[in-house]
């Protein structure tokens, strides 16, 4: 999903990407290979999160004056990342259909701190017991200001709406 979004935006914006993981640089390398944008890996030494200080140190590797958008892909769980401020202007999270529409009930903080929630793999709705409207209702009950968008990385559905949101929010900064 991230690579698909970057590939659609990179003609309009100068984009950088940071990937956070415990070990390896596989994710950063994958993003760089698929998109051609500079991507660096932040190794978090076994922690389940990163914070603004770690991001600040990683920013030294970028010429931020020549970036229009810097994307930080945090650790992929729904608990720890919500508890720590990364210094990001906006928080975006990804919930996929196979994970279930009950995730907002189980991990409320992540949904409370997210500005945009993308519900991915909507092309698989017929195969899973996932109620999109119920998931959206649960998210908005926790965070009335959140924007909830259905997307499919596979088909591209919804990606233009995500890009529109990113562009509008970027203009507000």
Positions of predicted regions on the chain:
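N-terminal/domain-start segments enriched in small and hydrophobic, helix-friendly residues
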Residues: 106-130, 166-167
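Residue-level signature of catalytic and energy-coupling elements of molecular machines
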Residues: 21, 73, 120, 135, ...
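Structural beta-sheet core signal
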Residues: 17-19, 93, 117, 150
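Canonical P-loop GTPase G-domain recognition
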Residues: 124-173
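Short glycine-rich anion-binding loops that position phosphate/pyrophosphate groups of nucleotides
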Residues: 75-77, 97-99, 123-124
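Inter-motif core of Ras-like GTPase G domains
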Residues: 81-98, 107-119
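Nucleotide-state-sensitive switch-loop elements of NTP-binding domains
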Residues: 1-89, 102, 111
């Amino acid at each position: 999903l991230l690579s698909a979004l970057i590939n659609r935006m990179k003609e309009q914006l100068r984009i950088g990407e940071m990937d956070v993981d415990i070990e390896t640089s596989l994710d950063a390398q994958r993003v760089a290979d698929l998109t051609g944008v500079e991507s660096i890996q932040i190794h978090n030494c076994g922690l389940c999160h990163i914070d603004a200080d770690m991001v600040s140190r990683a920013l030294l590797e970028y010429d931020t004056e020549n970036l229009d958008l810097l994307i930080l892909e945090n650790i992929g769980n729904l608990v720890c990342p919500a508890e720590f401020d990364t210094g990001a202007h906006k928080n975006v999270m990804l919930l996929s259909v196979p994970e279930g529409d009950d995730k907002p009930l189980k991990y409320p903080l992540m949904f409370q701190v997210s500005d945009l929630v993308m519900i991915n793999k909507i092309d698989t709705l017929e195969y899973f017991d996932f109620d999109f409207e119920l998931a959206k209702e649960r998210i908005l009950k926790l965070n009335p200001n959140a924007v909830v968008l259905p997307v499919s990385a596979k088909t591209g559905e919804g990606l233009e709406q995500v890009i529109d949101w990113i562009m509008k929010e970027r203009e507000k900064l």
